[in-house]
From Swiss-Prot:
Top-level lineage group: Bacteria
Leader sequence segment: 1-15
Coiled-coil blocks: 107-208
Localization terms from the record: Periplasm
Gene behind this protein: ybhG
Protein name in UniProt: UPF0194 membrane protein YbhG
Keyword Zinc: no
Keyword Thylakoid: no
The entry's keywords: Coiled coil, Periplasm, Signal
Length: 331
């Protein structure tokens, strides 16, 4: 074969290889990464925070619920009574604290001073009587028992005088700081009990925390529940998340904020739109639910993809194909 012909064939082959490589690269760029996942199953068990008898339930299995909707109520009467008791406790504690702060009135101080004078007079009389009895005892005019009775009366009068003096001193100086602090602490305790009673009454009504669909209703009216007992199981419908897994080789394509297209078997020509919201920082072995055979034994990273245009046709647990094409990434 002539040399020019050989060179020509080599050029043709090289051009074909280059063209093929370019076509493969371009095709890969156009098609992008494809992952397989499922719409995340998100359920929550709803319960009353307090216990009691179920008075009414407003929804049944299959009903759509909205955030803030009343779902059920316990018998409120026990909690209303507890609330009234707590309010009364606050009133008593407040009155006692106010008395401690205000101190004693002038009339009370005057009465205490009069009591001191009376006790002083009684003591003086008892002391004088005891002194006379001592003289009579020395002359053996009275018995030892008479002298002991006089001493006892004197000591009792002295104790009464001291008590009256202490009371007057307290009235004039006001209440001790420790007594005021104790009264304040009692008031704060009563206020905390009132807040707890108000919260318990509020929690005897079950409110939907978010939108969703009621899956199960575990009890009926008349049931006596312990606190925390499950009443409903709710499937959360918003937001809708897709759980998918990516291997380390393609991890750089799955960045938070990256937009993707989501395909389901029911509408293969009309994709949903999503955005990667979370990429797990740790690798894990591929879960059994992943449908891609070549990822079965790989270490992968979990993705959470938020569906931005979800509708009722996108059900929890549904398999989804995640497409990372250029069109999705730059929308």
């Amino acid at each position: 074969m002539k040399k020019p012909v050989v060179i020509g064939l080599a050029v043709v082959v090289l051009a074909a290889v280059v063209a093929g490589g370019y076509w493969w690269y371009q095709s890969r760029q156009d098609n992008g990464l494809t992952l397989y996942g499922n719409v995340d199953i998100r359920t929550v068990n709803l319960s009353f925070r307090v216990g009691g008898r179920v008075e009414s339930l407003a929804v049944d299995e299959g009903d759509a619920i909205k955030a803030g909707q009343v779902l059920g109520e316990l018998d409120h009467k026990p909690y209303e009574i507890a609330l009234m008791q707590a309010k009364a406790g606050v009133s008593v504690a407040q009155a006692q604290y106010d008395l401690m702060l205000a101190g004693y009135r002038d009339e009370e101080i005057a009465q205490a001073a009069a009591a001191v004078k009376q006790a002083q007079a009684a003591y003086d009389y008892a002391q004088n009587f005891y002194n006379r009895q001592q003289g009579l005892w020395k002359s053996r005019t009275i018995s030892a028992n008479d002298l002991e009775n006089a001493r006892s009366s004197r000591d009792q009068a002295q104790a009464t005088l001291k008590s009256a003096q202490d009371k007057l001193r307290q009235y004039r100086s006001g209440n001790r700081e420790q007594d005021i602090a104790q009264a304040k602490a009692s008031l704060e305790q009563a206020q905390a009990q009132l807040a707890q009673a108000e919260l318990n009454l509020q929690d005897s009504t079950l409110i939907a925390p978010s939108d969703g669909t009621l899956l199960t209703r575990a009890v009926e009216p008349g049931t006596v529940l312990n606190e925390g007992g499950t009443v409903f199981t709710v499937s959360l419908t918003r937001p809708v998340w897709v759980r998918a897994y990516v291997d380390e080789r393609n991890l750089d394509q799955a960045q938070p904020g990256r937009k993707v297209l989501l395909y389901t078997d029911g509408r293969p020509d009309k994709p949903y739109h999503g955005q990667i919201g979370f990429v797990s920082p740790t690798a894990e072995f591929t879960p059994k639910t992943v449908e891609t055979p070549d990822l079965r034994t790989d270490l992968v990273y979990r993705l959470r993809i938020v569906v931005t245009d979800a509708d009722d046709a996108l059900r929890q647990g549904m398999p989804v194909t995640v497409q990372f094409g250029n069109e999705a990434g730059h929308e």
